[in-house]
Regions:
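Sequence/structural signature of beta-propeller domains
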Residues: 1-151
Length: 151
């Protein structure tokens, strides 16, 4: 019988529901859990490295409303430090940005097909973001006034 996850959670372990995306900056690691949370709409956990002996984990974001991110999946850190997250759900798939205080902004919505955004990353030479449409075999290059979008 598969009881290990329940046994470990009872002993204080943090359960992850469908962990799919992982990225890091200088101080933390972010993990997306696509179907985590009370509504199964997703969570993002943040592991903070305080010292060599101490690491903390926090529930950084949990989707609780329809107008919030729905099933976070692939993730990256933007050159300006925001978290950029792709959705993976059966409805409308979007691309979101989150600042360090948890504020969000919508970057894009896939109205072309029902395919999810995947493999989001930034050029090392400028602020151009690249993202794939999974089932269409397309890679999009997105650039522009990021400061205006983040307001």
């Amino acid at each position: 019988e598969d009881t290990m996850r329940f046994d470990l959670a009872a002993k204080g372990a943090t359960p992850f529901a469908r962990p799919e995306g992982i990225t890091s900056d200088q101080a933390s690691i972010y993990v997306t859990c696509t179907s985590g949370g009370k509504l199964n709409k997703g969570q993002i956990f943040k592991l903070n490295f305080i010292s060599q002996q101490k690491t903390t984990i926090e529930l950084w974001l949990e989707s609780e409303k329809d107008d919030q991110i729905n099933m976070p999946d692939n993730v990256t850190i933007a050159p300006w430090g925001d978290l950029i997250v792709c959705e993976d759900n059966s409805k409308i798939n979007r691309l979101w940005g989150f600042n360090q205080t948890g504020g969000s902004y919508l970057i894009a919505e896939n109205s072309y097909t029902g395919s999810e955004f995947a493999g989001v990353c930034f050029s090392p030479f400028d602020n151009t973001m690249y993202v794939n449409l999974q089932y269409n075999g397309m890679t999009l290059a997105i650039d522009g006034n990021w400061k205006k979008l983040r307001r």
